[in-house]
Amino acid sequence: MEEPRCLQANCFFRGKEHSIQLSVSQAVLEVEVEERRSTKRWRGHFDAASVEDLTRKTGNFKQFGIFCSMLEAALMKSSEAVSLELLTYGDLEALRCCKVGVATRVPPSTSPLSSKRYLILVYCVEFDRIHYPLPLPYIGEADMAALRRLVQEQQDELAQLRDELRRAQQEVWRLEDERLRDKAWHQQEQRRMTKELTEVKAAEKMLRAHVKTLTAELAVCRKGRSTSATAPGCPQDRRRSNSRDSRSSSQGRLPPRSPSPAGSRPPRFNPTAFVRSREQRRQEAELRRQKLPRGTVSSGDNCRRRGRRSSSAESLQSRRSAQSSGSEADTCPQRRRGLGGPSTRSPLSASSCNSTSVASHPNRGCKQHGKENLGTEPSATLSEIDARLQALQAYISTLGTHM
C-alpha cells in the first residue's frame, strides 16, 4: 500500500498570504487552501479520472501522476515552466469573456459560485500557455477551539525546540571548551617535543663530533701500529749486511764459534750451501781413502755409515750434518791446544784425530752441534765449512809427512 505524500507551502496571491497543502494517496488528490489572516479555508478532492478529464478538456492531456508532479513543482517553485494562481469565479468568468470577446457577467453575491476559489496550474511552453483549473469549495472558517488547541500545540512544540536549542548550544559550548583545552595541551606537547628534538639534535651533533675524534684516533693508532710492525725489519737488514761482510772477510781465517742466542729463529734452509757441503764431503771422503791407512779409512767409513743411519731417521738432520762436520773440526784443534800446552796452532796427528773424531760417537756429536747451530745464519755455516776445509788440508799434509 502506497503511503500518502503530503506537501505544504505558503504563497502570496493578490497581496494576501495563503497556506496550500497537498496530499496524494491511492490515486486521490486533496488540495486545501487557507487564508492566513481570515482563517477561511477551501478544500477539494480529485480522483485520477476527474484530473485526466480536466486536462483533456484543456486540449493538453496529462496523466494523473504527471499532473501531481507538475503541481508539486509549482508549489515548491522548482521549475519555471509551471506556476500557481488563486482566482475567484468572477475572475475566471472575466478571463473567459475576454477570450471569447463578450461582456463580463458578474454573479450575485448570494450565489454559491461566488464563494468558490479556483487554484489554477499554469503550464507555459514555448509558444503556448495552458491553464488547469481546480475548483475548491468553501468549507468555512477554522474553529476557534481547534485553533486554540493548534496554537497550544505549536507553543509547546516551540518550547521544546527552544529547550533543544539551549541544550545544543550548551553542548556546542562544552565542545568548544574541550577543543580549546585540547588545543592548549597539544601546543604544550608540541613545545615540549620541539625542545626535546632540539636537545636530541644537539646530542647527535656532539656524538658525531665524538665519533669523528675517535675515528681520527683510531686511524693514528693503526698508522702507529703499522710503523711499529715494519720497524724490526731494519735490524734484520743490518744483520744480513753484516753477514755478507763477515762472509767476505772470513776467507782464509777461522772465526770463533759463538753459541746461538736462546729464543732465536732457526736458520732458513739454503739448498746451494747444502749441495756444496755434500760435494765437499764426497771429495773429503775420496781424499781420505787415498791418504789414510785401510784401518783408519774403514773406521771412518763406519762412522759415516752410522752418521747416515742416524740422520736418515729425520730429513732435517741431513741438512744440519754439514754444519756438524765443521764443528768437529773446531773441537779437534781446541782439544789439541789444551793437551799440547801452547796456544799456537799445531798440525793434526792421526792418533789424536782418531781418538777424538773417529773413536768417539760421531752421531752424538753431530746431534749436539746441530742443535747449537739451529739459530746461526748462512754466513756462519759458510765460515765453518771454510774452516773445516782448512783443517782437512792440514790433516792431509800431516798424513803426507808421516807416510
Swiss-Prot record:
Record's subunit section: Forms homodimers (via head domain).
Organism: Gallus gallus (Chicken)
Coiled coil: 144-178
Biased composition (Basic and acidic residues): 236-247, 276-289
Molecular function via GO: identical protein binding
Name of the protein in question: Centrosomal protein CCDC61
Further comment found in the protein's record: The N-terminal 3D structure (head domain) resembles that of NHEJ1/XLF, PAXX, SASS6 and XRCC4.
Region (Disordered): 224-377
Biased composition annotated in UniProt, kind: Low complexity: 310-328, 349-360
